[in-house]
Amino acid sequence: MRRGAGRLERAWEWLALHKLIQRGKELELLHRAMGFATLALVTLAPLLIVVAAADPLVRGGFPSWLSDGMGLSGRSARLLNEVFSPPREVIGTTSAWSILMLAVFGVSFGGSVQNAYERIWELPAGRWHRVWRQATWMLVLMAYLYQEVQTGTTVEGFSRSFLTTVTTLFFFWWGPWFLLGGQVRWRELLPGAIASVVGLAGLRAFSTLVFTPLIVTNALSYGAVGTVLVVSSWLIGVGFVVYGGALFGRWFTEHHWVPSHDDDDGDGRAGRGEGG
């Protein structure tokens, strides 16, 4: 019994899961995920609505983007469309000043994500002139979401799954590297990108099974507010996966990623790249 208990204790120490849990508490992971959802709904969603309304291919606009991400179909997708569909003249009634303000708010969302990555990797806060990184990241994010929706209507089956996996992996591999100015090496960011892809796939499956009927139920009970609450809950899940995946990636890199001699900085922690 003592030998078995000793082995379990050594296995627990080797896994170092307690350190991952501690990191999550220090980062206030759930609190950050809720902040991610709030900013996404308040700053990112209006910008995406305007961008989707300008879609020359006219494939459903912003609601189709949201339905695709949540894995909704049928009645739940129609209810979501009723709540989030903008008026047809949204582009004509949106002034240049309004679009500029939406862009500024969208960049603030990118800044929030950048700050979270800096906290996860324990790096100093980026200087104000790095706002161009946040803006560029936002543009790439919108391009990523756009291609996800467009390929969803033209590519099916294994090809769609493969394309989604590759583009999502690239985005979550490139995104932290770019926002952090190259201060963390590519190889150290790979585990976090993989964890984010797996987490989003699991969230999509959960959303299809749970949120699909929940949207219908909430719409009947609470109307449009019920639908927005479900979307907010899903966005909290997305934030948890995005930040949790990056946090898992750093933990895995430090405790289970075998570094090369060049990467070891002498204190047992993964090496860092040059700042940029």
What are these regions (language model features)?
Residues M1-G276:
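Membrane-embedded alpha-helices and immediately adjacent juxtamembrane helical segments
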